[in-house]
Amino acid sequence: FEKFSLSGNGVEEIYLHNGGKIGVMLEVETDKPATEEVRTMAHDIAMHIAAFSPSYIYETEVPEDYVAKEKAILLAQAKNDPKNASKPDAILEKMLSGRLQKSLKEICLIEQPFAKDSSITVGQLVANVSKSAGMNVRLVRFVRLVMGEGLEKKSDNLAEEVAKMSGK
């Protein structure tokens, strides 16, 4: 579990969804005391995180090994496509950069279309609120928890269980 504590101005938002089955903690940093507009934005973004399950806030946080694996998968898929059979690897890699960017946008919160207004991204929402509130606003970190996630489910085979009980 993670411990959240503000080191200055900002907002710590906690959002529980679906009767507490999904929980989100979000830390938002500001350079001035947070306004109601910033608190509302933090709440809305926490709801967005609960719904869309981003893995990271910013693209710079995505581990290099994830990007390398994703590139390898996309390259293998492209090579297996008969339409690309005669294309050299250099051309395929250029084609794949767009697909890779799309994949990264799906897992990075700041690049996702905002749940309450899909005409803007979460990043644009933060920039808009930052401008209208007259302060710097930055998403610092979040944790999304799902009840039961990470627990091993005991799977029993009914036939084996009956056989054990009957001594066979």
Give, region by region, the residue ranges found by the protein language model:
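N-terminal assembly/interaction segments in proteins that build large macromolecular machines
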Residues: 1-168
